[in-house]
Amino acid sequence: MSGRDNRGAGGGGGGHQPLSNAMGKLKEKLTRVGDELGYHRVESNLSTSNTATSLDTILPEDPFLFPQVSPQRHPQNIVRTQLLLEDEPPLSFRPLLEDDDINEPPTQQQQRTPLRASGSLELTPLPPPPTSLEIREHRDRQQRGAQGDDLQRSKQSLKGSRVSFERRDTGNSNTNSNKAAESSDEDSFEEKRTGFQQQKATSVDHKGILKDLKHILANDNRRQFQAKKHVSLDVKGTRFLQDLLKESSSEEEFHKTRREFQGRKHQSLDPRVTFKLDKVLQGSSTDSDEEGEDAEHKRLIHRPKDITKPVIIDLKDLESESDEDFLTSRQHFQQQRSISTDSRKSRRLYEMDEMGNKRGENIRHAVPFVRQITEDGKPKLEVYRPTTNPIYIWTQVLAALSVSLGSLVVGFVSAYTSPALVSMTDRNITSFEVTQDAGSWVGGIMPLAALAGGITGGPLIEYLGRRNTILATAVPFIVSSLLIACAVNVAMVLCGRFLAGFCVGIASLSLPVYLGETVQPEVRGTLGLLPTAFGNIGILLCFVAGSFMNWSMLAFLGAALPVPFLILMFLIPETPRWFVGRGLEERARKALKWLRGKEADVEPELKGLMRSQADADRQASRNTMLELLKLNNLKPLSISLGLMFFQQFSGINAVIFYTVQIFKDAGSTIDGNLCTIIVGIVNFLATFIGIVLIDRAGRKILLYVSDIAMVLTLFVLGGFFYCKANGPDVSHLGWLPLTCFVIYILGFSLGFGPIPWLMMGEILPAKIRGSAASVATAFNWFCTFVVTKTFQDLTVAMGAHGAFWLFGAICFVGLFFVIIYVPETQGKTLEDIERKMMGRVRRMSSVANIKPLSFNM
């Protein structure tokens, strides 16, 4: 040791060169020697981490090449590196841990003056580097083993690392041991390094380390989020936590008890674990005197801790009945208790929890705003949002029934000409003459007036309100029927029909808008078909009464029908959406309370209406009619207009207006009046079939079935009339026209009859709903006028078969229109439909098989 010290002293003290030159040469020499030996110096300031996780890198131990390096934390976070280039006993290493005492006095071997890596360099006499012979021997050992690769990887990973080495007391101070000892040391090092890597999972790959760290941090954040933000959808559990918060003496006590409760209460989504939990819960029992919620909470808290451990159970060993019950329960659990770690979803869950009433009905009857988890662990993209309130059905039925009586009047007025024209053209009954041309105007003026009423109705429902506009049509309906009943000439009949048609246009516009804004999405399809059903009742009533009454008595009956409609309209409120649009928040709240029930929490729905109205106001234009031409508004308007076009050009009103005449021309062996009654009954019953199917099969499926049925029957009916006019005798097929008419009416009433009106109130945006509905209604009645006014001319020019074939071809084109353009609106709120139609949400697959919620009758 003394010889080496003398050489070091002599080398460091010779000459009078400046100290800086000596420092530079010594540093350069040490660098060159260190690089030759495979050693990488730590020269940058390495600040210590104040977190609990550090990146520890393994440096292979070599008692010859790698001297002891012991980083110590400087008060200024400077790592001091100590280089010892003298023969020492074998070294071992370990990562520098956070709990190490950095103020512990250094050992005797560590009491050396360090080289500072922070820009300044303190020089002390250092031992010379190993001789070339020693270096050569070490390189030979490198070539014999695979240690060289480990050294290179360690060299690359040393940057930025914090490594601490400590001396291993082996009891042997002689470093020049034999080769067997060296081999033993190398094997010992390999074993320790392998064990360290297995225990600490420390990778020399920085990307792997960062990936593992991110995974650890993500799991830690998730656990913290679930512990702090997790809100239980279980009503009893949530209420218990709220009571626990009040009773806890400190926040720590509350969080501790809550974590214990949540850890044992919430079940795993793993089916095997969930099934095991269910079995354990079913097997648990308590004393008979421990009943009620307190006993339930006590059982939740004092469950065995190992209850949540995964237990592998083969579902094949279970009974099939238990298996089905389990799968049903698990699906229910996933829908009602699946918690998303997304903060927005969790905030919505928290809001839903606040909505719950004392009995928790809101939570139990709701599907939450969550990304539901499928069996393969992937989230569904569709988020289905029904109401969070139980459906209070009676008030909504009363509202739908009230406006549907107006639809009954509309149906009666529309079908009036079919039985009335037969007696009106009879000079033995009528005191004035009605020519064929005048009769066509009696049938055609009503749709023309409805066109004007549809245009006028749009502004009226915006300024007067939906309810008041519907109510305003009741008295004119009575006046129009009295004008016809007391008519002494054709002019009075035409005036009465024009006034009735004008009211029909307004009513047909406002009825679907009112229902669309008052009933809940879960029953909108069912109750939305009530106006169509009552309209068909009005048609049937007109056909049946027309077979026994002349045109004047039939008009008096028409004057009596609006009376109950007028009375019931005074009992229902205005739509909450219209109140919100006028800034009448309190009246909107009262209307919602009336519609949803006094015990219902209407604040969330009211807030949704206000947000929707605010969006509509921000995007509103002074010229609403020009707003219709914007691209995002043109799409829903075009769909609505297309449905109205294909509805009317299916020829339905030509069939209804001239049913008796068509059966007479067909030469049917069945009485014409009886045929009209049969058609009316089928039309009425088919609507109720549609009511049952529309919220189960969906809108588009019913449109497909409706269109195909009409195409087939119209082509067959056209073939019958063609054969009758040009072909063989078809008198033995007198039943065929009635059969085709029944199937045709059945198909129309299932789909293209009610759905275009229903979807008009669904797909049109709120800010243009009044004007757009006005345009769609006017267009519908324009098409009705064209079809009814030109039907007789078509039969003369093309023959009856040509007219029916034309209607069938149009229906065939309508099938492709429905397939390509018409969206499915089943089970969606108006806000969701509007966002999708306006292009503000991405296209997502619909949630299948979600049934409507149970009713509180």
From Swiss-Prot:
Its main location: membrane. InterPro entries: MFS_dom, MFS_ERD6/Tret1-like, MFS_sugar_transport-like, MFS_trans_sf, MFS_Trehalose_Transporter, Sugar/inositol_transpt, Sugar_transporter_CS. Residues 134-143 have a biased composition (Basic and acidic residues). It is a multi-pass membrane protein. CDD domains: MFS_GLUT6_8_Class3_like. Residues 171-181, 330-341 have a biased composition (Polar residues). One of its GO terms (molecular function) is trehalose transmembrane transporter activity. Residues 1-27, 92-203, 327-346 are annotated as: Disordered. One of its GO terms (cellular component) is plasma membrane. The chain crosses the membrane at residues 393-413, 441-461, 474-494, 498-518, 529-549, 553-573, 637-657, 674-694, 701-721, 741-761, 768-788, 802-822. This is Facilitated trehalose transporter Tret1-1. It comes from Drosophila sechellia (Fruit fly). The gene is Tret1-1.
